[in-house]
Amino acid sequence: MTVPQERIEIRNIDPGTNPTRFARGWHCIGLAKDFRDGKPHQVKVFGTDLVVFADTAGKLHVLDAFCRHMGGNLARGEIKGDTIACPFHDWRWNGQGRCEAVPYARRTPKLGRTKAWTTMERNGVLFVWHCPQGSEPTPELAIPEIEGYEDGQWSDWTWTTIHVEGSHCREIVDNVVDMAHFFYVHFQMPEYFKNVFDGHIAGQHMRSYGRDDIKTGVQMDLPEAQTISDAFYYGPSFMLDTIYTVSEGTTIESKLINCHYPVTNNSFVLQFGTIVKKIEGMSEEQAAEMATMFTDGLEEQFAQDIEIWKHKSRIENPLLTEEDGPVYQLRRWYNQFYVDLEDVTPDMTQRFEFEVDTSRALESWHKEVEENLAGTAE
């Protein structure tokens, strides 16, 4: 047996543990129009169950799903007027969480209240506010409006929903600073990559091309396209990305939503969608086709991410190079949503900017692509 004279210190992975609480902030639970079909909808989120329904004016409401009478599931009930009726005993609950009627009883219990969740509808999607302390959202936390969305300047949303098991939401948020994974996982060539953190907002600015040796998604349809992406997380779970796709002298502007909400502390629902801004000469059908093409490409990319998450370890102490970006700063920023408001510290919210020097990475990547192309040509 050979015993080394000097023991080399081995770096071990600290997997840590997932937070037991759910993030404070606005969480998108889906397209608003999907909840306006005259039926109640059950949403599993934040370790509980909610029911979403529309009243006669079309306003969406979100309540705890289980009736305070005998625990019936309101999502299995029926919308009656401006109330949701329990399928068990027909108790009627309005959008503010008050019991309005018990049809078989002489009186309605004065203490008949259930939890009504704070909601916001913006850009055609529905948000629910969550805070473990019970605080209400302040105006500066509102999701920004997309200019021209209400005026018909954009296509309709294309939308995809995927349930991710065995991973915490932080896995997808880590992608905000992960420049290198765009090359290895998504087959893109990032030429410029910068992060900006400020308050509750985290930004990612990227300029990229597709790889010449591997064509997937949008690259199949627009092989020479340059992608200019300015993406911002508004809080812990909702990203709005403005993307300019430049190809053959034409610039196409699109908006990407990349959002998620936690189901448990080890599973979440990932949702994403695209709208395309209509340009002169572009028909409604062409704009819709373009949005579908972009969303199909996103679905392929997220499938690549999910395959990584399914088989990786959670890691609290990643070993990094300068080109890996500000991972630890991102996580400090992200932690502000998992502590009480009074425990948010300046290093979680102060402005922080970091631009990755991509020169060494590009040198290596261009060489790898050239070698792959040469091997294919043989």
UniProtKB/Swiss-Prot annotation:
In vitro, catalyzes the introduction of a 9alpha-hydroxyl moiety into the ring B of 3-ketosteroid substrates such as 1,4-androstadiene-3,17-dione (ADD), 4-androstene-3,17-dione (AD), 4-androstene-17beta-ol-3-one (testosterone), 4-pregnene-3,20-dione (progesterone), 19-nor-4-androstene-3,17-dione (nordion), 1-(5alpha)-androstene-3,17-dione, 5alpha-androstane-3,17-dione and 5beta-androstane-3,17-dione. KSH has the highest activity with 3-keto-delta4 steroid substrates. InterPro entries: Cholesterol_7-desaturase, KshA-like_C, Rieske_2Fe-2S, Rieske_2Fe-2S_sf. [2Fe-2S] cluster binds at residues 67, 69, 86, 89. PROSITE patterns: RIESKE. Homotrimer. The two-component system 3-ketosteroid-9-alpha-monooxygenase is composed of an oxygenase component KshA and a reductase component KshB. Keywords: 2Fe-2S, Iron, Iron-sulfur, Lipid degradation, Lipid metabolism, Metal-binding, Oxidoreductase, Steroid metabolism. Induction: By cholic acid. One of its GO terms (molecular function) is iron ion binding. Disulfide bonds: none annotated. Fe cation binds at residues 175, 181, 186, 305. KSH activity is completely inhibited by zinc ions. KshA is specifically inhibited by Fe(3+), Co(2+), Zn(2+) and Ni(2+) ions. This is 3-ketosteroid-9-alpha-monooxygenase, oxygenase component. Residues 26-128 form the Rieske domain. Pfam families: KshA_C (PF19298), Rieske (PF00355). Its cofactor is [2Fe-2S] cluster; Fe cation. Optimum pH is 7. Binds 1 [2Fe-2S] cluster per subunit. Binds 1 Fe cation. Optimum temperature is 33 degrees Celsius. GO terms for biological process: cholesterol metabolic process; lipid catabolic process.
